[in-house]
Amino acid sequence: MTRKFFGTDGIRGQANSFPMTPEIAMKVGMAVGYIFRRKGQASRAVVGKDTRRSGYMLEKALVAGFTAAGMDVFLLGPIPTPAVAMLCRSLRADIGVMISASHNPFYDNGIKLFGPDGFKLSDQIELQIEAMIEGDMTPFLASHGDVGRAKRVDGDIYRYIEFAKRTLPRNISLNGLRVVVDCANGAGYKVAPAALWELGAEVITINNEPNGININEDCGSTHPIGLMKKVHEVRADVGIALDGDADRVLLVDENGTVIDGDQLMAVIAESWAASNRLEGGGIVATVMSNLGLERFLADRNLTLARTKVGDRYVVEHMREHGFNVGGEQSGHIVLSDFATTGDGLISALQILAVAQEQNKPISDVCRKFQPVPQLLKNVRTTGGKPLENKRVKSAIDEAKERLGGQGRLVIRPSGTEPLIRVMAEGDDRGLVEKVVNDIIDVISSESSAAA
């Protein structure tokens, strides 16, 4: 069934434009409140947000919807996405909401929903919400005496800081480690530096002064150049780059080299397998993860299960098949021993634990495999279904033949933007580049002709 509001990670779009309007946000609150409200009992929602200016507007609209449906609301303020999932369980809430567009620019925003178990909602529930939003909302309103209330929660970030710190083994501290943290002017700007400092690290923080419009602006995990320079400038042992809602992380080693999610998963998988902590006989990643990771794991008799792009699909596969490590190349790392969703801070702490335990520099710890040449390009589309076009399909089939058994080709529409993502990888770099560029050219020409 076609989805009108929900993408791969909740509802997302430009703030104050469809579907990210106060009206839609209020209807989401009403629909979700009705679905998760416990009849005859007090029910509650927890609502967090990142640092975007439009978060105030959407927060108030969601509160109106939830309270109209008879739910009480706990307002968490600016806080990481994984903290909302954790506090949803800790505060015995019936639903959790994070207002964020993750790594997108400030003018975008989104709504992510978590069930009472802290996991993102299923496709079926999201479709139910969509159907309710499109219909008459009157039947979902609470009676006069059952309208909900809202209150701010004090000390919520400190609960999360303590939770994150407890994931570092008690016999390990970060004493002697100089760490630069890029907070992306986002939701992790208070919690990440505090947690690292309390664990003993010398912390240098950058991009920790959010003003509502500078979130992800030339900073964070999608723009690590500033962090690379700072690590070199202060001679740090490691740099940690979060994104706007702190659910993803990339590292920078002491030489200023970026370490992506594939390498981080390799470190954790190898370490946890050696200590008999790894479950499922391997890890879960998406179709975008590098072939080098798959080969690295296979050499250690570990498997790589692949899913569609989106950490929700990674988590679903982990739960269904008994894995406890999964993630994405982009830096969403899911460690189900600790969390129900990607957690940038906790993932970084596990890597630092390995480095401290082995007494090795980050560059030695995190260079687990040589990535296979991989190229990802995006082409903007003007509507329609370009992947069903005859010329585009023919170009894709031809590309697969050229790559043969020595590479992979992944072509998919973005779940959050009007883009087609084209990724190829293989041992022959020149062939990979030619394959991607040829497909991009065909999609561009056919999309322009259709417009």
Curated annotation (Swiss-Prot):
It comes from Brucella abortus (strain 2308). Its EC number is 5.4.2.10. It holds the Pfam family PGM_PMM_III. It catalyses: alpha-D-glucosamine 1-phosphate = D-glucosamine 6-phosphate. Gene3D superfamilies: Alpha-D-Glucose-1,6-Bisphosphate, subunit A, domain 3, Alpha-D-phosphohexomutase, C-terminal domain. This is Phosphoglucosamine mutase. PROSITE patterns: PGM_PMM (PS00710). Keywords: Isomerase, Magnesium, Metal-binding, Phosphoprotein. One of its GO terms (molecular function) is phosphomannomutase activity. GO terms for biological process: carbohydrate metabolic process; peptidoglycan biosynthetic process; UDP-N-acetylglucosamine biosynthetic process. The gene is glmM. Activated by phosphorylation. GO terms for cellular component: cytosol. Its cofactor is Mg(2+). The keyword Magnesium applies. The keyword Metal-binding applies. Catalyzes the conversion of glucosamine-6-phosphate to glucosamine-1-phosphate. Belongs to the phosphohexose mutase family. It is an enzyme of class 5 (isomerase). The modification Phosphoserine is found at residue 102. The active site is at residue 102. Mg(2+) binds at residues 102, 243, 245, 247.
